[in-house]
């Protein structure tokens, strides 16, 4: 396959410019040509020319708590049915999707997004402890430590193959998994709060393995 990657980046509460730059470096080291897109509209329009879509963004309705009220006018977002239709169709026809960190919180009014990812954040159930040192265990052996967040209770679907679990509060939590969707492939890596996570050698290596699996 060719190696054209689009990175959808931006949103609330995270240093997306720096984490997207770090992701771009990892992709380019493995031969991917990258472009960064800042709206879902442009991202969906790019799909016919994209082999891999990376979502490193946080856009959702912001209706769950009044603490988000000051940000709603500028950042609240509702993905349309047609946008989700096009994402599903693109992956199902053979597209590759890598969802990073907050991608599993996006598009909360569209349950099909989590269906495509094979699981993700459930408002009122999922949560994360404060950013800090965490331990990650790989299901095929090995472990590493880094500074990041461990999302709890993401509930991967039965079709998801868990690659890694993170531990900080309630015991090991699935934080990295893959799944097939039609002719396409999807990987979710719920790590990656900021550049420190992407600069951790073991996490970079894990992302590299995910990219290899996606490109297969």
Predicted segments — roles?
Residues 1-52:
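Aromatic-Pro/Gly-enriched surface loop or interdomain linker
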Residues 11, 103, 192:
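Residue-level signal for short, function-critical loop segments
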Residues 2, 19, 29, 39, ...:
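Extracellular ligand-binding/catalytic regions of CAZymes and related secreted enzymes
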Residues 51-56, 186-190:
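Structural motif
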Residues 60-141:
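A glycine-rich, often tryptophan-bearing local segment used as a flexible ligand/cofactor-contacting loop or short
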Residues 21, 112-196:
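Catalytic beta-strand/loop cores that center a nucleophilic Ser/Cys/Thr
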Residues 29-35, 73-77, 140-142, 164-167:
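Short, flexible loop segments at the rims of nucleotide/cofactor-binding pockets, characterized by
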